[in-house]
């Protein structure tokens, strides 16, 4: 679906899910399409960014874990297309449960920052 020009529809869905009353503080929304058993497309609408981001390892790993547990992917070498590129995900299972995830793909440093302790709320530094 994402590859068929439905980006605006997905963005509206992402906004709706991100602000759903079930999540009082908001939530990230992961929208996906299955291209084949082990080839997925995912878009993550992130809280705070209020738009799609290039990639989300947590969302990507969660998607593969869920689809593997449901038997919809093999869990081995699953290709997941993010806006920022492709990740390969392996979901290890132990006794029928996902026990580990391995995400492999490129990583690029896009910014760097420093927050001094004085800028943090007092309870954060204890």
Model regions: which residues?
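Conserved glycine-rich phosphate/nucleotide-binding loop
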Residues: 65-126
